């Protein structure tokens, strides 16, 4: 029978237990082993294999997928290793095996055959005296923490620890490799990640034909007609060659009215415009544009300039456009 109050109490109890055990993980895990393992991976020329049985295997698969996404030669060894899959392993390869207990039967059966291949064996376990720890060339010792279930048997906390280690290792390798957004995007052309990683400003800008332009000599009063005719909240101040001289926004107008009153309406734009606004090149990554909008003094629109000269305006990049594209 479902009792809401009981379910709520149990949920809160498990939630607090999660917080406690995760805190103990961070207090007891020595991340220097990640540094050492990263250094070996960076110097390694061959393949790197990860594997595990059951839930540990799921964590190994996830780590492989993450590392492959930024170009690492990482592969998953299936449970059929001794039924032919051993053929992909070569001398000198690195093989990393996940086992919380360090006594997983299938894993222990693999070890002699992997040793015969002269691999560098990495054991990732929570049991320092386990067979996996003893026979490994390098050991990643994860904190031994109790599981969340009443029997202390169901892989919950242990797999969370494995996942935290995996993400730390993958991101350390990524940072050391100095993987750029462009590098990552080449391996991830599809989905929302692909849109963010590969999108260029030119793909999202409003073209020059839709940009509100004004001459620097017209008054603020005259510019208001242009400003109110478009939905950008700004006008771009340009010369006859469409070189960007500055920008005037509705925020500039409010500040001017507050400081100068109605007299600002008769001022020429060149006296009140922002002369060095944030701009972005049309061939820049769209995520750079989003970062520029949100950093410093936040803005919702960026003038886009040509890639060659970096001064002729070719369009506008608007926050609303990026939101509609699902990039926020």
Curated annotation (Swiss-Prot):
GO terms under biological process: carbohydrate derivative metabolic process; carbohydrate metabolic process
Repeat among keywords: yes
The protein's name: Uncharacterized protein TC_0679
Domain SIS: 37-179
Span of domain CBS: 205-264, 273-328
Family: Belongs to the SIS family. GutQ/KpsF subfamily.
Alphabetic keyword roster: ATP-binding, CBS domain, Nucleotide-binding, Repeat
Ligand binding (ATP): 52-57
TM region positions: none
One Gene Ontology molecular-function label: ATP binding
């Amino acid at each position: 029978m479902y009792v809401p109050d009981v379910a709520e109490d149990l949920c809160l109890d498990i939630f607090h237990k999660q917080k406690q055990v995760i805190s103990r993980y961070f207090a007891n895990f020595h991340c220097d082993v990640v540094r050492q393992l990263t250094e070996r991976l960076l110097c390694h020329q061959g393949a790197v294999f990860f594997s595990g049985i059951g839930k540990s295997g799921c964590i190994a698969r996830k780590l492989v997928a993450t590392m492959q996404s930024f170009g690492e030669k990482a592969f998953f060894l299936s449970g059929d290793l001794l039924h032919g899959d051993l053929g992909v392993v070569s001398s000198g390869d690195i093989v990393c095996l996940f086992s919380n207990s360090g006594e997983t039967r299938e894993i222990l059966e693999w070890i002699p055959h992997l040793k015969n291949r002269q691999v560098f064996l990495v054991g990732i376990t929570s049991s320092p005296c386990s067979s996996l720890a003893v026979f490994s060339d390098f050991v990643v010792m994860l904190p031994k923490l109790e599981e969340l279930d009443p029997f202390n048997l169901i892989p919950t906390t242990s797999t969370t620890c494995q996942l935290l280690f995996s993400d730390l290792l993958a991101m350390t390798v990524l940072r050391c490799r100095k993987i750029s957004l462009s590098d990552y995007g080449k391996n991830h052309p599809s989905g929302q990640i692909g849109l963010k990683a590969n999108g260029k400003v030119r793909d999202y800008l409003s073209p020059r034909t839709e940009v509100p332009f004004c001459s620097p000599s017209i008054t603020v009063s005259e510019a208001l007609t242009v400003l109110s005719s478009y939905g950008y909240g700004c006008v771009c101040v340009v010369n006859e060659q469409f070189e960007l001289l500055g920008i005037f926004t509705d925020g500039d107008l409010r500040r001017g009215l507050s400081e100068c009153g109605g007299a600002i309406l008769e001022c020429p734009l060149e006296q009140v415009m922002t002369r060095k606004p944030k701009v972005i090149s049309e061939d820049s990554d769209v995520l750079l544009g989003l970062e520029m909008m949100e950093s410093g003094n936040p803005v919702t629109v960026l003038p886009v300039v040509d890639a060659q000269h970096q001064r002729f305006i070719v369009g506008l990049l608007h926050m609303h456009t990026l939101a509609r594209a699902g990039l926020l």
